[in-house]
Each structure stands twice: as structure tokens, then as C-alpha cells.
């Protein structure tokens, strides 16, 4: 189970600013948060060490590279215990940018980008469906992506946190 990290209001502000612009200078973040640049540096280091921040990355618009088809592929496995082996093979397909082990009818949900529908069909038929233990695939092509954002960085609590706080105050 993932570790839940308690973060204060300043940490929330830092994260919200960095999610919007990972290149924002620490001094600018410090001005926004009303603390020193050194405090921001220390807090970011602490958030990195705690695993809250796992790095910063440059985002590339797939369409700018001619990758005009975004597809989600639901994958059924003939043997669910072979999931790790299937993932090793899926990692070798550069068109796949994201993969999730999911509940329900399918075992894996993969997100991929292709040049066009012919490219997508080629990857599905000649690469993905030839991987051992992949029983079948079901493909959905994305027509639009009206929402694209990072994780929500606000003052949110787990559902049980409010009751714990209330009980401790009594």
C-alpha cells in the first residue's frame, strides 16, 4: 500500500506551482509562498526524499511529432499469473506510453500513440497480439482529450481523517 504523506499549506502551494511550471525558480516560488528561497529548497528536497516529488519532465505534444492517433487498448490474458512477463514485452513497444494493471473484464489497460490507423493496426496485429499470454485486445481510439492535467494539489483529506481528528478533540 502506498504511503500517505501529510503536507502542510506551504508544501501544497509549492507543489501547485511546480505542477504548473516545473522550471519555476525557487526564488519566485519563495515570493509566492512568503518564505525564503532556502526554505523552498529544503522543502522540495524533503518532498523528493519522501517520494512525493519523483522528478520533473519535459512534456512533448505527440501530434507535433506526427503521432495523431491516441488509443487505449484493453488486454485480456490467458493466464493472469503471467502478467509480469507480458509487461516486460509491452515495455519493448515504444508506442505504449502508459500501462495499468486493472480490475474487471481485462487485466491490462495500455495507452499508446501511433502515426495513423494503419500504424495502430500494424502494432496491434504484428507486435502486441503476438506477445505470449495475450489472449485478446479491445481498442478504443481517443477522438479528443478535453482534460489533461497533473494530480490535484489542494487541501484534501482522506475520508477517515476528519473523523479521526474529531474523535481526538473530544
What residue ranges belong to the model's regions?
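A compositional/biophysical signature of low hydrophobicity enriched in polar/charged and small residues
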Residues: 1-170
Amino acid at each position: 500500500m502506498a504511503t500517505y504523506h501529510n503536507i502542510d499549506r506551504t508544501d501544497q502551494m509549492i507543489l501547485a506551482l511546480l505542477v504548473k511550471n516545473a522550471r519555476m525558480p525557487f526564488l519566485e516560488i519563495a515570493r509566492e509562498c512568503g518564505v525564503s528561497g532556502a526554505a523552498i529548497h529544503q522543502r522540495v528536497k524533503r518532498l523528493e526524499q519522501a517520494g512525493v516529488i519523483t522528478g520533473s519532465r519535459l512534456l512533448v505534444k505527440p501530434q507535433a511529432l506526427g503521432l495523431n492517433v491516441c488509443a487505449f487498448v484493453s488486454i485480456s490474458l490467458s493466464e493472469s499469473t503471467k502478467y509480469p512477463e507480458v509487461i516486460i514485452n509491452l515495455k519493448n513497444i515504444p508506442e505504449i506510453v502508459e500501462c495499468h494493471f486493472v480490475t474487471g473484464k481485462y487485466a491490462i489497460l495500455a495507452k499508446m500513440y501511433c502515426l495513423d490507423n494503419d500504424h495502430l493496426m500494424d502494432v496491434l496485429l504484428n507486435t502486441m497480439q503476438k506477445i505470449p499470454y495475450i489472449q485478446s485486445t479491445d481498442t478504443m481510439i481517443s477522438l479528443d482529450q478535453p482534460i489533461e492535467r497533473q494530480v490535484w494539489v489542494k487541501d484534501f483529506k482522506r475520508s477517515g481523517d476528519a473523523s479521526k481528528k474529531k474523535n481526538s478533540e473530544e
